[in-house]
UniProtKB/Swiss-Prot annotation:
Name the UniProt record assigns to this protein: Protein translocase subunit SecY
Function: The central subunit of the protein translocation channel SecYEG. Consists of two halves formed by TMs 1-5 and 6-10. These two domains form a lateral gate at the front which open onto the bilayer between TMs 2 and 7, and are clamped together by SecE at the back. The channel is closed by both a pore ring composed of hydrophobic SecY resides and a short helix (helix 2A) on the extracellular side of the membrane which forms a plug. The plug probably moves laterally to allow the channel to open. The ring and the pore may move independently.
HAMAP family: SecY
Cytoplasmic side: 1-20, 89-110, 179-184, 267-291, 385-427, 466-488
Gene3D superfamilies cross-referenced by the UniProt entry: SecY subunit domain (1.10.3370.10)
GO cellular component, one term: plasma membrane
Membrane topology: Multi-pass membrane protein
Topological region Extracellular: 48-59, 136-153, 204-244, 314-364, 447-450
Gene name in the database record: secY
Keyword Cell membrane: yes
């Protein structure tokens, strides 16, 4: 008996959101998407009962814009468990260790979805338990423990239960959006978190609490409320790198422009309908063919490595210096320092006095980050294309099923597959590597609102793709015959 037969009784009974039986009207899809978005913002503002927020430490602070969620809320873990489970499944599927045919076998599809949910539950435990009980990153409030009479261990149990419920909720919220809404829940949550930071970075006012945003700062500079240094060197540093944030604004606008341009670069393969004369179309193979979602997997892998390092530092007294050295919870040396991604200008601009790190160490760290992101982006893009039905074989079958064919070629899926193999694998690798390079460069230069460059890159690309999906949904809504022809529902 194989593992599928042994695991089927458990995996097939995993709770799941029911698929719609027929076509879901566009307005209803928008309603589901908007409702889940409101619920997400609500849950990020529900604080953990029993948490001593004053001494709590956000393990995913540097990666929060990518992993979504909110520190100290029931969505403490964000999409981390979902993404980590996806990494494991991508690696197992890429090595063909699962033996699942998710394209053609309904039974394997059910097993795959059940296995994903099981892995998400495991990742919630593997991430949440050390965070609460071992590393003391989410300490219990002593006053709550005394008033309830259950001790700090009991309060920590309550904290873990809350973040576990939050992890399960975000899993099913993602599934609802994927089946009943527009786009994916993971992408929606990233857009929500990054947009919130971006708007705050542009429009926040010091009088409302916190630091001044970009516009408030420049109003102060223009009116003279904020004094600028007299020295030309200090003036340029303040305007571009300091309060003025001009470099951050330029980087933000540059990322918007590059991503929108890259999304529009494509190779278009002509198609014609086999039975309807004059019906023609094109199959676009975009430069960023695999989308930017594989980049979430790469950054999440880095986040898990750093999470493990901080956990070891807090619980392993004799942790060797070659593995990692920490100062005030931040890695400053050892292997984990070199593996830590560049997050902002303060991590590498030694020539401006923004960091005291050795220039050679900084150069090695930047080089490792570039290699990790470029190679990782390409590898995960390949895995993503193959496991999401975007590879040459799956695409050829979809074109065949829609009644389309490539002019000048026989109407045969094998023939279409050979044509697709000329473009899809190469474009997938180039696009994945390009996104990795852009992510590192964006992080190095910084962005408005202290949003990570990777987070902004993901947000712009996901928003662009969401716009395309909404336009496609509206077209299908106006012309139901096209929906039947291309099998959208």
């Amino acid at each position: 008996m194989g593992w599928k037969d042994a695991a089927e009784p458990v995996l097939s009974r995993m709770p799941a959101v029911a698929r719609p039986e027929g076509h879901v009207p566009f307005r209803r899809k928008l309603g589901w998407t908007g409702g889940i978005l409101v619920l997400y913002f609500f849950l990020t503002n529900v604080t953990l009962f029993g948490l001593d927020a004053a001494t709590a430490n956000d393990l995913f602070g540097q990666f929060r814009s990518i992993l979504a969620g909110q520190q100290g809320s029931v969505l403490q873990l964000g999409i981390g468990p979902i993404v980590t489970a996806s990494i494991v499944l991508q690696l197992l599927g890429g090595a063909d260790l699962l033996g699942l045919d998710t394209d053609n076998n309904p039974r394997d599809q059910v097993l795959y979805q059940g296995l994903q949910k099981l892995l998400v539950g495991v990742m919630i435990c593997l991430t949440g338990l050390p965070m609460v009980f071992a590393g003391n990153f989410l300490p219990a409030d002593q006053a709550v423990a005394t008033s309830l009479g259950i001790g700090t261990v009991g309060v920590k149990g309550l904290i873990f239960a809350q973040i576990a419920v939050g992890g399960v909720l975000i899993l099913f919220m993602d599934e609802i959006v994927s089946k009943w809404g527009v786009g994916s829940g993971v992408g929606l949550f990233i857009i929500a978190g990054v947009s919130q930071q971006l708007v705050g970075g542009l429009f926040s006012w010091q009088g409302l609490g916190g630091t001044s945003g970009f516009f408030a700062t420049w109003i102060g500079i223009i009116t003279g409320a904020i004094e600028l240094p007299a020295s030309p060197t200090d003036l340029l540093s303040t305007v571009f790198l300091g309060q003025g944030q001009l470099l951050a604004l330029i980087t933000t606008l540059l990322i918007f422009g590059i991503v929108v341009y890259a999304e529009s670069v494509r190779v278009e393969i002509p198609l014609s309908h086999a039975r309807v004369k004059g019906a023609r179309g094109r199959f676009p193979v975009k430069l960023i063919y695999a989308s930017v979602l594989p980049m979430i997997l790469v950054r999440a892998l880095q986040a898990n490595i750093q999470f493990l390092g901080r956990f070891l530092n807090s619980s392993w007294v004799g942790m060797p210096a070659w593995l990692g050295q920490y100062t005030s919870g931040q890695v400053t040396g050892g292997l984990l320092y070199y593996l830590a991604p560049i997050q902002s200008r303060s991590d590498w601009m030694w020539f401006l006095g923004l960091t005291s790190a050795d220039p050679l160490d900084i150069a090695i760290r930047v080089l490792i980050d570039l290699i990790f992101m470029i190679v990782g982006g390409a590898v995960f893009a390949i895995f993503w294309v193959e496991t999401t039905g975007m590879g040459p074989k799956s695409t050829a079958q979809q074109i065949q099923n829609s009644g389309m064919q490539i002019p000048g070629f026989r109407r045969n899926p094998q023939v279409i597959e050979r044509v697709m193999e000329r473009y899809i694998p190469q474009v997938t690798v180039i696009g994945g590597a390009l996104v990795g390079l852009l992510a590192v460069m964006a992080n190095m230069l910084g962005t408005i609102g202290a949003v990570s460059g990777t987070g902004l890159l993901l947000t712009v690309s996901i928003t662009y793709k969401l716009y395309e999906e909404i336009a496609e949904e509206q077209l299908m809504e106006m012309h139901p015959m096209m929906r039947n022809m291309f099998g959208s529902e």
